[in-house]
Amino acid sequence: MHTLPAVALIREACPEADITWVINPEWAPLLRGNPDVNHVHLFPRGEFRGLGAAGTLLPWLKQTRKLRPDLALDFQGLLRSALIGKVSGAKEIYGMSDAREGSRWFYDCIAKVEHGEHAIERYLKLAECAGARVNEILRYPLPSGDPLPRFDEHPPFILLHPFARGRSKSLSNAVIEEFCRLFAPTRVVVVGQSYRKFAPPANCVELTNQTSLLQLIWLIRLAGFIVSVDSGPMHIAAAVTDRLLSIHTWTDPRRVGPYNPDAWIWKNGQLLHVSELKTAKIRRRGRRFKTKDVPFVAELIRPLVPVDPMLI
């Protein structure tokens, strides 16, 4: 997600360039119909493990060697991504100054980035090294998404994405249930990937583990408001709408929060517009989002998603 605006600016600067994007298959649907990308080269990382890894890795390396680009841009900044650039036969490899795991040794040009910068701002600096000109308007050429079968677009609903890979960033079952209860009778659609089970109230549409990435994008575009923990889907929402609240327990919203000045963030019991983050005083040490925090959030969201008269 964070790389989309950078690649869009590179395309504007180099309209005749042949751009190939190396990407993990699970995120490849984000590039469907992207006018800035000519080719998608899948990196099936999960298949390169175990006893049969060589049988998959060797053919992939052979195909990757055929790419031979004039320039490879390492937006990930890891040894693995730098090695992919090297294997591709790129004439030059550009990366960022905060790259890790020794990946900087592979770079021919290094973009100077600051520690406290947002990921998007860091990636834009790398794009500048490739000739892009950064302006205030950024493009996120996301697909429109795929409709979810048997899902009614009306009445309006709130989309809740409460799960993250880090357990400490996820919302508890009690918070999810309290969130649904406070917004009844308005529908609360719960999405995401999780093995956890919770007791969904009557107004909850429980879609955990039941949506593809493209179906999730479709739901994000339809939702009256989105509440999400710090995650990939949150960043998708930030690119689509400002009707978003991003919940940050331990992460710094200045660095990894929504890159949308009109979106909202929650941190340590505070609700702030993203545009207020530069001057706001926020405690570095975070805490979990608790059931006592739900009414505070509900006061923000309820005026934006009023109860449909047909439900009263």
Regions found by a protein language model. Give the residues of each.
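Catalytic machinery of carbohydrate-active enzymes
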Residues: 1-312
